[in-house]
Structures are given as C-alpha cells and as structure tokens.
Regions:
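Short, flexible, glycine/charge-rich loop motifs used to bind or transfer phosphoryl groups or to couple energy/partner
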Residues: 1-3, 26-28, 100, 127
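Short, small-residue-biased leader/transition segments that mark boundaries at the very start
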Residues: 1-13
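Short, well-ordered amphipathic alpha-helical segments that serve as non-catalytic structural scaffolds
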Residues: 14-27, 93-98
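Claisen-condensing/thiolase-fold acyl-transfer catalytic domains that form or cleave C-C bonds
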Residues: 36-143
Length: 143
C-alpha cells in the first residue's frame, strides 16, 4: 500500500496521484505496462488530463489509465461536466465494475489509486490548507 498525504493549499489531487503512482513504480520496479488497468479515484476528466500531462512531461505515456469519476457516467449522454466525485464514486466503480470485470477475466492486474481531499468548512473559512490524499493498491487475480 502506497500512500502520500500532503497538506499544501496548491497541491491538487492529480499531483498526489502522480506522486503516489511514481512512488509505486519506483519502489516496486513496475511500469504502467505491468498492469491491465490503472484507475484513479474521482479526479474527473480534468484531473485525469492533468495527471496524463504530468506523466507526459516525464516521457511516460499511459494507454491503460482510467478514472472512476469518468467511468461512473456516460459524458456523451449525461450532463456531468467533469464526472463524478466523492468517496462513494470510487467505491461504487471499484466494487461494482472493476472487481466484477476482474472476476469475468477482463483484467488480471489492476492498480487502484484512490484520491481525496479532507474538506472542512471551518478550516476553509479560516483560510487553512485542504489536506489531500492518494493511496495505491495493486490488485491481481490468480493465474
């Protein structure tokens, strides 16, 4: 389990996802191609594009990156702007779609990277930073 917690007002969840995924690859020696699917939690379409840009800057291209906030809706037929958000979004996509897809043999190796922000109205009104978090869990099925 890789987890990074930051409390900087200028850090986006996409930045933390980048840091966590990089740490996972560095610590395990794995690459994006070692996974059938890499999924972030509720960055939405904008956050996903920011994350892809961060990796592109380092010369790393993903063909297997998805986001729960994008997967949970059909942006072509629903007016959802950037997609879903919140911890329920990631939980629903992981347990209702991704794990079932693994059971059906669609994917064998998954890197799931949940992201979030610990929002507090009091902290925000006091001008304090918004702590953000990202954790990565590698999930695989037996061969």
């Amino acid at each position: 389990l890789h987890q990074l917690i930051h409390s900087f007002p200028t850090r986006r969840s996409s930045d933390l996802a980048y840091d966590t995924i990089q740490a996972h690859f560095r610590d395990t020696g794995r690459r994006p191609s070692d996974y059938d699917l890499i999924v972030t939690g509720d960055l939405g379409s904008l956050g996903k594009e920011i994350l892809l840009d961060l990796f592109h800057r380092d010369g790393i291209e993903f063909k297997n990156l998805e986001d729960c906030g994008v997967l949970i809706y059909d942006a072509q037929t629903q007016d959802v702007h950037c997609g879903g958000s919140g911890c329920g979004c990631s939980a629903a996509v992981l347990t209702g779609f991704l794990l079932n897809g693994m059971k059906q043999g669609r994917w064998r190796r998954l890197l799931f990277c949940g992201t979030g922000a610990l929002l507090s109205p009091t902290s925000t009104l006091q001008g304090e930073s918004i702590p953000s978090i990202c954790h990565a869990v590698a999930i695989s099925t037996e061969q």
